[in-house]
C-alpha cells in the first residue's frame, strides 16, 4: 500500500509513476479529495468532543451549585448526535479512501524500464547456449509419459485439467530438485522454513493478493482460509504486526511448498505438460531488509535463482520487467527465463522482486535501528528459487537423449542416489 503522505506532498510524482503503469492518474486527485474530507471531518469531531467535554463539566458544576442544567444537557445531547452523524460520515469516507489506496500498485523504481507490455522488457543477461539436437527433440510431456514418469490422464480423472501425478523416477527427480534448491539457498544464508499452506485473509491482504486478485485464489469457504499461491505469503506474514530489532536484519527465509492458482484468464495457454498448473511445487526466497539495502539484496537474490540453472548447466536469460509488465506490489523485478526446446523459446522460471515498503505497510512490519529510535517500515523482497515443475520440464527437455532416455544432470546425481540415466 502506498503512503498517503506521498499523495499530500508529491502528487505529481505519484501521478508520473502511476502513468508509467498506464493507470488513470485522476485517482490521485480523488484520493486527495477524500483525504482532505477525512481530515476535515476528523478535526470537526475533535472540536465537538472538546465542546461536549466542556459542556459536561458545566453540567457537573451547575449540579454542584444546585442550578438548572436542562439547557446544557440538551445542548450536550445535540452535540453527541452531531458527533455520531459525523463519525458515520467519516467512517464511510475513510473506507472509500482505503478501498482506493489498497487497489493501487506500488510505484516503480527509477531503474525499472518504461514500457507498455512484455514486449518491452529488457534483457540484462544471457547465460549458456541452447543445445543443438542431432535428432528430433521431443516435448517434456511426451518424454515423461513414455518413461512413465508422469500420468496426466489419471490426474485429470482424479482432479481435472492442469494437474499431474509424478510417478517412479518422475517423483524422484522432483524431490531431487527440491532438495538441491533448498540446499543451495541454505548455503547462501537462507533459513529453511516449513510453512502453513492455508492462510487467512489478513495474510493475503498483507502480501497484496487481496482484495484485487481474489479470483486467482482457491478458498476454503467453510474456514475462511485460502490455499497459498506462493510461500511468499506465509513467509512474509511471519513478521506481520511486529517490530524487528536492527540486528534481525537482514532476515532471509526459504521454503518449498505446493502452490495453488486458479489460472483465471489463462484458458488455452500452456495446456499440455507442467508449465501452467493449478497445483505445483515451488522453492521460494523471502528477505526482510533495511530500505537502503534492498536493491543490492535484489541483485543477490536474483543471483541465487540464476545459480540453480548454472549448476544444472541449462541456458537461461534474465530480463528486467518494464513498467507495463511488472507485478502489482513490485518496484523492480527481474524474471529469469529458462530455455525450453519444445517452445524454441525462453520461459519464466523465476521472478525476483523488491517490494520496497509496499507489503510492509499493509502487513505492518517495522524495525528499529536502536531501542530509542522511531520504528520504520522494512523492505520486503521475494523470488522463486525456482518453480520446481518448470525446472523439471527444463531438465527433461535439455537432457533428453535420442533413445528416449534422460541424462541426470551431474549436480543431481547424489540426490538421485547415484542414478545417472532415467530410462
Swiss-Prot record:
Binding-site residues, L-serine: 230-232, 284, 384
Pathway the protein contributes to: Aminoacyl-tRNA biosynthesis; selenocysteinyl-tRNA(Sec) biosynthesis; L-seryl-tRNA(Sec) from L-serine and tRNA(Sec): step 1/1
GO term, biological process aspect, one: selenocysteine biosynthetic process
Record flagged with keyword Protein biosynthesis: yes
Single GO term (MF): catalytic activity, acting on a protein
UniProt-listed InterPro entries: aa-tRNA-synt_IIb (IPR002314), aa-tRNA-synth_II (IPR006195), aa-tRNA-synth_II/BPL/LPL (IPR045864), Ser-tRNA-ligase_type_1 (IPR002317), Ser-tRNA-synth_1_N (IPR015866), SerRS_1_N_sf (IPR042103), SerRS_core (IPR033729), tRNA-bd_arm (IPR010978)
A GO CC annotation given for this chain: cytoplasm
Top-level EC class as recorded in UniProt: ligase
Catalysed reaction equations from the record: tRNA(Ser) + L-serine + ATP = L-seryl-tRNA(Ser) + AMP + diphosphate + H(+); tRNA(Sec) + L-serine + ATP = L-seryl-tRNA(Sec) + AMP + diphosphate + H(+)
Domain notes: Consists of two distinct domains, a catalytic core and a N-terminal extension that is involved in tRNA binding.
HAMAP family per UniProt: Ser_tRNA_synth_type1
Family: Belongs to the class-II aminoacyl-tRNA synthetase family. Type-1 seryl-tRNA synthetase subfamily.
NCBIfam families: serS
Listed name of the protein: Serine--tRNA ligase
Gene name of this polypeptide: serS
